[in-house]
Design a protein with these regions (language model features):
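Charged, amphipathic alpha-helical linker segments immediately N-terminal to NTP-binding catalytic cores
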Residues: 1-28
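Conserved nucleotide-sensing/catalytic segment adjacent to the nucleotide-binding pocket
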Residues: 18, 25, 73-135
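Pre-Walker A adenine-sensing motif
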Residues: 31-41
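Phosphate-binding beta-loop-alpha motif at adenosine-nucleotide cofactor sites
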Residues: 48-52, 150-160, 182-187, 201-216
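Glycine-rich phosphate-binding P-loop
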Residues: 49-67
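Conserved nucleotide-binding/hydrolysis micro-motifs of P-loop NTPases
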Residues: 56, 83-86, 112-115, 158-165, ...
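A glycine- and Lys/Arg-enriched "phosphate-lid" helix/loop adjacent to the NTP-binding pocket
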Residues: 119-135, 145-196, 237-240, 244
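NTP-dependent small-molecule kinase module
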Residues: 197-260
Length: 260
């Protein structure tokens, strides 16, 4: 097996793909996604994809490319806001349950119940007792979803501190990304180490090294297509790069593959 390491970077790295190569590759993979949707509609499958990661790790852009040419009737994106007062007094998982996929549906969660393990814990929006109460049953909750027939895929998009800083600064000056600017953006960098400490117990995930957002998008789609069965699959197109999409290994916390 090839050794996987993280290259130290300061700012944006040189692109691995030309703009045209990226567009061509994305188009071919989106054709495969349409095939996948046709198949899971015919077979009454239920698919749930969760994307987690630090602020500005590329979740929005990845989801946009996945759903771009899919039927909106059978595709839903879930990005829940601040919990209501009622949510705050309910069983923690309760607010997510209504959004789970039914037969013939693909649902993508842009962040998920893992908010409790990440941003809520770091920012003090939950108590340590509430965090521990979440971490205990979360695996059982997900096993229950899988036993009910939901095909569950979980991706954690991992970026370097330098890349996050550049992307957050870019949001502030881009008039088309003002909706992404948040009052807690500055806290993402200030609390970098606390987010790392909160991230680690959430494993295992499929890890995506996402400093290059184009490569991350393509390889996430490839991994989704590899993991799910559908008719007419073009196997030549869907092999993801093992340097970008990784099955979680605890050693990655020590050898620098995951951003420290």
């Amino acid at each position: 097996m090839n050794k996987i390491t993280r290259k130290k970077e300061s700012g944006r790295h040189a692109p691995e793909l030309s703009k045209q190569s990226y567009k061509d590759g994305l188009h071919r993979l989106q054709v495969e996604l349409v095939k996948l949707q046709r198949h899971f509609i015919n077979c009454n499958d239920k698919i749930l994809i969760i994307l987690e990661g630090r602020d500005a790790s590329g979740k929005d852009g990845t989801i946009k490319r996945i759903v771009q040419h899919l039927s909106p009737r059978e595709t839903r994106v879930v990005a829940l806001g601040k919990p209501s007062d009622r949510d705050s007094t309910s069983w923690y998982f309760q607010r997510y349950v209504p959004y789970l996929p039914a037969a013939q549906e693909l649902v993508l969660f842009n962040r998920s119940w893992y908010n409790r393990a990440g941003v809520e814990r770091v920012m003090g929006f939950c108590t340590e007792a509430e965090h521990e109460e979440f971490m205990g049953p979360v695996s059982d909750f997900e096993h229950m979803l899988v036993r009910s027939g939901i095909k569950l895929l979980k991706y954690y998009l991992d970026i370097s501190k330098a890349e996050q800083k550049q992307r957050l600064n870019g949001r502030k000056t881009d008039p088309l990304k003002q909706w992404k600017v948040s009052a807690i953006d500055d806290q993402a960098l200030k609390n970098w180490k606390r987010y790392s400490a909160a991230r680690n117990p959430m494993a295992p995930w499929t890890i995506v090294r996402a400093d290059d957002k184009h490569l991350a998008r393509l390889n996430i789609i490839k991994d989704v297509l590899t993991r799910l069965h559908y008719a007419g699959k073009d196997e030549r197109l869907i092999l993801s790069d093992p340097q970008i999409v990784l099955t979680y290994d605890a050693a990655y916390l020590e050898n620098g593959v995951l951003a420290p």
